[in-house]
Amino acid sequence: MSTKVTVELQRLPHAEGLPLPAYQTAEAAGLDLMAAVPEDAPLTLASGRYALVPTGLAIALPPGHEAQVRPRSGLAAKHGVTVLNSPGTIDADYRGEIKVILINHGAAAFVIKRGERIAQMVIAPVVQAALVPVATLSATDRGAGGFGSTGR
């Protein structure tokens, strides 16, 4: 069973007429975000290029939460289009428009039309660290090994 939190959502003028973000299945983790580009001016994302795509939405998250902007697997698998800074983080105190940085890793140009589902947004609790400076860290079996040090 999932936990529900209240998130205030503001639809900006250029998102009028678009559906609000929605979970596509009962157990979905992410709400689909849509492109709020003009109907008569779709955005063409050439191969190897990236763009900041507007959603026309702003949110107010409850304290202690974040929103993560993540890729949609279908866009990545079928077209090579993904979220460049995945996951993008929306902090609880941010009130600006949610925009998605999409990059086209595919061979062909990709056209983003108004209302196209371009990313998903996952709401998650946040844990803030209390940093404690120390002279040395506790020892572990792994130590400083990284970047494939545990095998393939």
UniProtKB/Swiss-Prot annotation:
Could you give a single Gene Ontology term from the biological process aspect? dUTP catabolic process
The cysteines joined by S-S bonds are: none
Q: Which residues bind substrate?
A: 72-74, 85, 89-91, 99
Entry EC number(s): 3.6.1.23
What is the enzyme's class at the highest EC level? hydrolase
Family indicated by similarity:
Belongs to the dUTPase family.
Q: What is this protein called?
A: Deoxyuridine 5'-triphosphate nucleotidohydrolase
Gene (name only): dut
